[in-house]
Amino acid sequence: VIKIHILALSLLALLPATNALATVCVNEKGVPTEVHYDLTDKFNSSNNQVGQVVTLSEKSQWVGVNAVCPKGTVGNTTKRSYVTDYPVTGTSDGYQYLKLNDYLDGAMKITDSYAGAFYPPKNYIQMGSHPNVSKNKPFGVQDSSLIFRLKVTRRFINMVVIPRATMFRVYVTTTSSDPLTTPVYTISYSGIIQVPQSCAINAGNVVEFDFGDIGASLFSKAGVGNKPEGVSSQSKTIAIKCTNVEANAMLTMRVEAEKVSDNVLVSDNPDVGFIIANESGAPLTPNNLTSKIPFRLDDSAQAQVGIRVWPVSVTGNKPAEGRFTSRGYLRVDYD
């Protein structure tokens, strides 16, 4: 028994020494640098087809990032790892495509002064040597010539807004066994992709529904997801007119919103929201590609689509008294 206890103590004593051998280099400024790629572009009609690939303008300059490795680092060579939270959807010409949204996949090629061209995500890529690596002094991360490709996975109308997001976190280490814990820099992206195919909804005007005054206690009595007693839904017919979209094309209309709880658009009063439904009263689920109203354009590339809206309780609680509003977006897509 005594020997077993001594052995356990010996192993514990060795653990700190093993961890101390890990070499994780960091940004010289103490925080990761963000290298941002603006994806804003205008596609032509032939680009807006499933499977089409568009290569964006090269971000040719050096990323401008310096790293520093900890004291006690042995050797002057480093490795870099490019880590993403997105799954790889496919590979073509070396490019590894990641899903950016419901319409576009994105992929990147990067060139290093030593390693040459490579296609992230990839871990522990062998890079060159710099005398400052072992001296606890800054050295350049020589990434340049960032080339971004977009692949259309679903045709779209008007535009796609791509919110700012991180595509890769870049780590610098000295061996392939070092943990990837502290990024030296990140590669982010955002932008707006426009296409010639467009549809004007309600002639570009806001579609408004005004339900007047509703007693606050009626929402708590109604319960979660239910309409207050005595309040009727409101219906409107939305005019749609398309340009550069073939006549008689099958399209869909769906709802997008920023604040959502299940199929409810949450208002600026968190206890109250609205449901948007088709003209038959079947609710639409916001931000869901499969929850949609199908329709066909006429010979003039126009259509009329009916929707219904009603207020509901989001939480089942009695809401604070006062005016409440909610905002959503109607989006037209190819079916």
Give names to the regions the model predicted.
Residues 15-19:
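N-terminal signal peptide c-region/cleavage motif recognized by signal peptidases
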Residues 21-335:
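Mature extracellular/passenger domains of Gram-negative fimbrial/pilin and adhesin proteins
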Residues 9-10, 20:
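Cleavable N-terminal signal peptides
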Residues 1, 13-14, 141:
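Intrinsic-disorder-associated interaction segments
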